[in-house]
């Protein structure tokens, strides 16, 4: 089963990826993990990626696609994979189609965990972090016992700059602009399935299971 998981920040994509990985035993492959592995193993492409990353530059498509191809050719992907964070553009999506064809593979589903923008803003702006131990809370979904205070060590909880309302709205706007052409691409190919992510995480996963059981 070869899957791509898509969703905006705060949609709960990471949670669903972990559940898919656990139930179906297919590797959850994120772009960051792929880069780290290639750099750690000292592959030619890993060295090239490191050069760009060390300079704070974006890694070019040809290097990224090469690293993806190396990763998908590994033994643990023989029975499937779950891609997360790649592709990010329609050009990368086209390159992925080509490299999968070279490997004798194809995509089964592109699962889009869809959550209304206002809900994403609520989820992201409600996050609070303990600066001492790193424990994460949410003012609505996972509040501390005492408002604004960490349950574990009594530290004053903080809101990260990234989670300020204006920053969150800007980040979502950029992501929506980048993601829509990709969703259209996979819709046209017949791979795209949308799952309503604005529900309990177990209910969302049941929907994903019902899609995957059809395969």
Swiss-Prot record:
Annotated segments matching region LID: 126-163
Matching InterPro entries: Adenyl_kin_sub, Adenylat/UMP-CMP_kin, Adenylat_kinase_CS, Adenylate_kinase_lid-dom, P-loop_NTPase
Residues annotated as binding Zn(2+): 130, 133, 150, 153
Localization in the cell: Cytoplasm
Any one Gene Ontology BP term: AMP salvage
CDD domains: ADK
Domain comment in the entry: Consists of three domains, a large central CORE domain and two small peripheral domains, NMPbind and LID, which undergo movements during catalysis. The LID domain closes over the site of phosphoryl transfer upon ATP binding. Assembling and dissambling the active center during each catalytic cycle provides an effective means to prevent ATP hydrolysis. Some bacteria have evolved a zinc-coordinating structure that stabilizes the LID domain.
Subunit structure: Monomer.
Family stated for the protein in its record: Belongs to the adenylate kinase family.
Protein name listed in UniProt: Adenylate kinase
Name of the encoding gene: adk
């Amino acid at each position: 089963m070869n899957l791509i998981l898509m969703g905006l920040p705060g949609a709960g994509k990471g949670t669903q990826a972990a559940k898919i990985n656990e139930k179906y035993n297919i590797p959850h492959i994120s772009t960051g993990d792929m880069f780290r592995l290639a750099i750690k193993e000292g592959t030619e492409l890993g060295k090239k990626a490191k050069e760009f990353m060390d300079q704070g530059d974006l890694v070019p498509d040809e290097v990224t696609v090469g690293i993806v191809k190396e990763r998908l050719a590994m033994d643990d992907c023989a029975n499937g994979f779950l891609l997360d964070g790649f592709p990010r553009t329609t050009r990368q999506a086209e390159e992925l189609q080509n490299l999968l064809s070279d490997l004798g593979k194809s995509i089964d589903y592109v699962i889009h965990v869809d959550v209304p923008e206002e809900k994403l803003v609520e989820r992201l702006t409600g996050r609070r972090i303990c600066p001492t131990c790193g424990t994460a809370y949410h003012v609505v979904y996972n509040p501390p016992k005492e408002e604004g205070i960490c349950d574990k060590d009594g530290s004053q909880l903080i809101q990260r700059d990234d989670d300020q309302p204006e920053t969150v709205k800007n980040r979502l706007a950029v992501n929506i602009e980048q993601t829509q052409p990709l969703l259209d691409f996979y819709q046209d190919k017949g791979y795209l399935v949308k799952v309503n992510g604005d529900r309990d995480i177990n209910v969302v996963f049941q929907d994903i299971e019902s899609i995957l059981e059809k395969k």
